[in-house]
């Protein structure tokens, strides 16, 4: 566990910046994202292209909803300074685009990892700057 913490805590802090404490699953998730980034597999590249082609506010909504809050629409809205109905609208738009509901497993597994890799590549943008 010590080795996991020492190697992947910085990545976990980048991927999950609003967490105060990290458990073993968080660190293993960070390790998986870090490995995906280093291996640059075709799935990672495909997902990064999909995320890059989306509007910035939709990607930020996904990260807030899936990574920063426990899939809580109201908390995601508070984090992004938008109304919860805006979050619902954006998630519906994303669902239509991807063909599945974000957060529902197992369909969302690759999406979670892609968002983690996205944060490792680009850091954590300040959601307060997003607006509508």
Predicted regions located by residue number:
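Cytosolic nucleotide-utilizing catalytic cores of signal-transduction proteins
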Residues: 1-132
């Amino acid at each position: 566990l010590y080795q996991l913490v020492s190697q992947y805590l910085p990545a976990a802090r980048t991927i999950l910046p609003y967490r105060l404490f990290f458990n073993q699953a968080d660190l293993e998730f960070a390790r998986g994202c870090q490995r995906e980034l280093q291996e640059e597999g075709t799935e990672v590249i495909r997902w990064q292209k999909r995320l890059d082609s989306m509007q910035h506010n939709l990607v930020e909504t996904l990260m807030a909803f899936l990574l920063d809050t426990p899939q809580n629409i109201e908390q995601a809205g508070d984090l992004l300074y938008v109304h919860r109905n805006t979050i619902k609208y954006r998630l519906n738009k994303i669902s239509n685009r991807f063909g599945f509901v974000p957060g529902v497993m197992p369909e969302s597994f690759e999406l979670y990892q892609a968002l983690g890799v996205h944060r490792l590549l680009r850091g954590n943008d300040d959601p307060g700057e997003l607006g509508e």
